[in-house]
Amino acid sequence: MTLKSTTWFPTVIYAGLNENVDRKFLKETALYWQSVEPAPTYSMNSNDGGWHSRSIEIIDAVEDKLKDGIVAFKNELDNSIEEVRKEIGFPELKFQNFWININGYGASHKFHNHPDSLLSGVFYIDIPNDNTSNIEFQRNDD
């Protein structure tokens, strides 16, 4: 008997470095946002010791002085999403929401999932050179 292999449940992870994003602006925006908005209580579900912004579904809800930079960032994300979408053959996708996390020394993210998401992503603005851990992915096939 000859066996044929097929891939049924792959886990594909895309990674890249986007040099078009103004990280300095995003870092300043994140720190400003943290200073004016306390972390919502639901953020304790996934963040341990850090700050987690509210979820941003509507760019127009962002303060005017931050909007241009956030829109430019979102446009870069949209370009990446479109590239992945075409490669894997998904129908047109719509960017749903994002949030900002700030984790200082000793803070971390708990394992969590993003239900009902076709794609999820992480964009690192600033990472110290030491005392940081790697991102981890788990797959629950139960």
Residue ranges of model-derived segments:
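Generic structural signal for short, solvent-exposed loop/turn connectors between secondary structure elements
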Residues: 1, 18-24, 94, 113-119, ...
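Non-heme Fe(II)/2-oxoglutarate
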Residues: 1-88, 108
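A short, polar/charged loop/turn motif at coil->beta-strand junctions and beta-hairpin connectors
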Residues: 7-10, 92-94, 131
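A short coil-to-beta-strand element that immediately follows conserved catalytic motifs
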Residues: 87-98
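Catalytic core of non-heme Fe(II) oxygenases with the double-stranded beta-helix
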Residues: 97-142
